[in-house]
Amino acid sequence: MSMQDTVGDMLTRIRNAQMANKVSVAMPSSKLRKSIADLLVNEGYVASAVVTEENNNKATLTIVLKYFEGKAVIETIQRFSRPGLRQHRGKDAIPTVKQGMGVAIVSTSQGIMSDRAARAAGIGGEIVAFVA
């Protein structure tokens, strides 16, 4: 059976790995997952994200999680827009997360970016997830 919501699966894998205090989490790779992982690295929520080619030409995305004083850096990570109900917002309606302390992941015509970058660029898009 094929996976319907790859981004939701990615976020759930990260959440479960952090609750189990894992060092890293591996998952099948895609361009969307890689760009979301790169955004999490740039925002400081995860240590690194690397794509490796496995046997049979299957790419695997490995995300190294980040902890501070024994606690996970990511407090909450949740899917906002989902396959059954897509959530698109204009540049003025992009929500802030935890009064600016978190980040909303926005899929725009110029790629995946944070809510702050989308507002600065003056473009809206699909609100993929919230991370705080």
Curated annotation (Swiss-Prot):
<dbReference type="InterPro" id="IPR000630">
    <property type="entry name" value="Ribosomal_uS8"/>
</dbReference>
<keyword id="KW-0689">Ribosomal protein</keyword>
<comment type="subunit">
    <text>Part of the 30S ribosomal subunit. Contacts proteins S5 and S12.</text>
</comment>
<dbReference type="GO" id="GO:0003735">
    <property type="term" value="F:structural constituent of ribosome"/>
</dbReference>
<comment type="function">
    <text>One of the primary rRNA binding proteins, it binds directly to 16S rRNA central domain where it helps coordinate assembly of the platform of the 30S subunit.</text>
</comment>
<comment type="similarity">
    <text>Belongs to the universal ribosomal protein uS8 family.</text>
</comment>
<dbReference type="GO" id="GO:0005840">
    <property type="term" value="C:ribosome"/>
</dbReference>
<dbReference type="GO" id="GO:0019843">
    <property type="term" value="F:rRNA binding"/>
</dbReference>
<keyword id="KW-0699">rRNA-binding</keyword>
<keyword id="KW-0687">Ribonucleoprotein</keyword>
<dbReference type="InterPro" id="IPR035987">
    <property type="entry name" value="Ribosomal_uS8_sf"/>
</dbReference>
<dbReference type="Pfam" id="PF00410">
    <property type="entry name" value="Ribosomal_S8"/>
</dbReference>
<keyword id="KW-0694">RNA-binding</keyword>
<dbReference type="GO" id="GO:1990904">
    <property type="term" value="C:ribonucleoprotein complex"/>
</dbReference>
<dbReference type="GO" id="GO:0006412">
    <property type="term" value="P:translation"/>
</dbReference>
<protein>
    <recommendedName>
        <fullName>Small ribosomal subunit protein uS8</fullName>
    </recommendedName>
</protein>
<dbReference type="InterPro" id="IPR047863">
    <property type="entry name" value="Ribosomal_uS8_CS"/>
</dbReference>
